[in-house]
């Protein structure tokens, strides 16, 4: 008791309530078997309300039941275009998104007023039906006849959501046609009415349907645009989408962020060129707020590129045009505008945290913790407070699209360095404690030995004869030297064992990190292989279903 509707926006599978609404389900199933709904358009789509179709004329005024289309010789034929659907007595309601109902109208019986009071009224329906696009539409109960529920296509981002977000005109009709391309009856438990004959093939579009065509779902709206403009539009759309994604994940303060226009990037410098020299050369173009040649943190060697921040945008532009390919310290330098927004992001994070510390990576790169700069664009350009300190910009991404991958790479490298630093600090502390404890123990032992030696010397001076005093003194000194040599050997052996243990722990931690890295790499490869296999399988299934529908 299921029907598959293949629409231009995706597939919809409907389960029918054959026990609660047998007459409505019979009408719907036989119309589907007759391909009555093929190429019907959703002529009425109201956001978060309903999507209506089932009228071959696509006007909302046509459509007929299956019994009115039977031959006149049939026992089940009816002269009326409409039929009376069942009343479910409150068992079927419009409570969930995806409820399928026949669009009904009231027929007033004699003695009833316009509101249906003072007499009796009955609901009549033809072929038009609608699908609800929201939960809890209980005010439709008693006015229309539910007979099914969407079981596939109602998930978030599915076909119903695509229909719900379609652009419509003033008459609530989608600007781009949403049509039922094909109908497949998966299961039909009802017998065919007398005189019913299903067509042998899918019928061709009627002239009425052709005249009602608007903008086809596969028609290119930019067909009159030249390829260059179309490519530019595509690139702009991709750039805006990527920037919006970075803003949502927190990598950018806002999607429209732009690099500062008063900062120049200078590269191909001589390793001997210093920040003061570069500032002196560029200062003839205007006031310089900061000039820094980026250096390696460990060795202190120049990385041969620098950032120069001018007070005004015009000064930076003049320096850009005048200093391009100029010889500085026997090197032809290259000047360009800075494309980095990392400092802007760090300042934004600091403001968002309402005075709390900015991310550690931001301060490690040289940013000032006491000042907050404003780089949002306004009529006068980017503004900045007087701060001459610039942070380290090496390995910064030059393209906006690489910001997310660069941040993830920097985070992994930073965590690796911090783990090594913590291990090194712990080992240094242990070695310092060991070296500090050993002299203290030696001093305490030497003090005890000195007191014991003085006591023995005093005892010998009192009880030993003068002739034996020299021999006893030599014997005591030899014993003291022997104990001192033994203590020295013990100290050396303990220090060697401590160093050996520390080297063994460092080697074990390095092997653990290598093993974890290899395991993560194998897991990523396996996940990528599974994803590709699943994509290939879905593509093959889609191709087979498309070939089957063509046949």
UniProtKB/Swiss-Prot annotation:
Annotated InterPro entries: CRIP (IPR035542), Cyclophilin-like_dom_sf (IPR029000), Cyclophilin-type_PPIase_dom (IPR002130), Nucleotide-bd_a/b_plait_sf (IPR012677), RBD_domain_sf (IPR035979), RRM_dom (IPR000504)
Extent of Polar residues compositional bias: 66-88
Localisation: Nucleus
Basic and acidic residues biased stretches: 384-397, 408-454, 465-551
Organism: Mycosarcoma maydis
Name of the protein described by the UniProt record: Peptidyl-prolyl cis-trans isomerase-like 4
A UniProt-annotated Pfam family: Pro_isomerase
Domain RRM per the UniProt entry, residue ranges: 262-340
Region (Disordered): 54-88, 352-551
UniProt-listed Enzyme Commission number(s): 5.2.1.8
Entry's Gene Ontology cellular component terms: nucleus
Keywords: Isomerase, Nucleus, RNA-binding, Rotamase
């Amino acid at each position: 008791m299921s029907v598959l509707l293949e629409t231009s926006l995706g597939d919809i599978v409907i389960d029918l309530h054959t026990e609660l609404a047998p007459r409505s389900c019979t009408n719907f199933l036989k119309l589907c078997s007759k391909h009555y709904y093929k190429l019907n358009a959703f002529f009425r789509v109201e956001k978060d309300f309903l999507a209506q179709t089932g009228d071959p004329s696509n006007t909302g005024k046509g459509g007929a039941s299956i019994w009115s289309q039977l031959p006149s010789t049939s026992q089940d034929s009816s002269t009326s275009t409409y039929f009376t659907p069942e009343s479910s007595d409150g068992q079927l309601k419009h409570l969930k998104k995806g409820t399928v109902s026949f669009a009904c109208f009231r027929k007033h019986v004699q003695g009833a007023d316009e509101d249906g009071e003072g007499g009796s009224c009955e609901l009549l329906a033809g072929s038009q039906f609608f699908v609800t696009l929201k939960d809890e539409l209980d005010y439709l109960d008693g006015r229309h006849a539910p007979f099914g529920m969407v079981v596939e296509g109602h998930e978030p981002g599915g076909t119903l959501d695509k229909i719900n977000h379609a652009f419509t005109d003033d008459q609530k009709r989608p600007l781009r046609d949403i049509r039922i391309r094909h109908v497949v009856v998966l299961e039909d438990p009802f017998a065919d009415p007398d005189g019913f004959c299903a067509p042998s093939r899918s019928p061709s579009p009627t002239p009425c349907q052709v005249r009602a065509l608007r903008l086809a779902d596969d028609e290119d709206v930019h067909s009159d645009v030249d390829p260059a403009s179309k490519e530019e539009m595509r690139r702009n759309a991709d750039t805006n989408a990527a920037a919006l994604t970075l803003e949502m994940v927190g990598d950018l303060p806002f999607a429209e962020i732009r690099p500062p226009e008063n900062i120049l990037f200078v590269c191909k410098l001589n390793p001997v060129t210093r920040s003061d020299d570069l500032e002196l050369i560029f200062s003839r173009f205007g006031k310089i707020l900061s000039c820094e040649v980026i250096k390696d943190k460990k060795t202190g060697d120049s990385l041969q590129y620098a950032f120069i921040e001018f007070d005004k945008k015009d000064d930076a532009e003049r320096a850009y045009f005048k200093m391009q390919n100029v010889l500085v310290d026997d090197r032809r330098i290259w000047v360009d505008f800075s494309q980095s927004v990392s400092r802007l992001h760090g300042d934004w994070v600091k403001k968002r945290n309402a005075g709390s510390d900015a991310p550690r990576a931001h301060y490690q790169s040289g940013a000032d913790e006491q000042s907050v700069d404003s780089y949002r664009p306004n009529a006068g350009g980017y503004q900045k407070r007087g701060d001459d300190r610039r942070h380290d910009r090496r390995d910064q991404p030059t393209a906006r699209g690489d910001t997310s991958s660069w941040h993830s790479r920097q985070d992994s490298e930073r965590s690796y360095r911090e783990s090594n630093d913590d291990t090194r600090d712990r080992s240094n502390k242990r070695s310092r404690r060991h070296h500090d404890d050993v002299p203290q123990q030696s001093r305490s032992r030497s003090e005890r030995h000195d007191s014991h030696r003085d006591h023995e010397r005093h005892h010998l001076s009192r009880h030993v004869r003068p002739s034996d005093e020299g021999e006893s003194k030599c014997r005591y000194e030899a014993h003291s030297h022997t104990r001192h040599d033994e203590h020295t050997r013990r100290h050396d052996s303990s220090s060697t064992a401590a160093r050996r243990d520390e080297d063994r722990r460092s080697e074990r931690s390095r092997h653990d990190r290598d093993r974890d890295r290899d395991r993560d790499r194998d897991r990523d490869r396996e996940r990528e292989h599974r994803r590709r296999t699943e994509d290939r399988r879905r593509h093959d299934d889609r191709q087979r279903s498309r070939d089957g529908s063509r046949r």
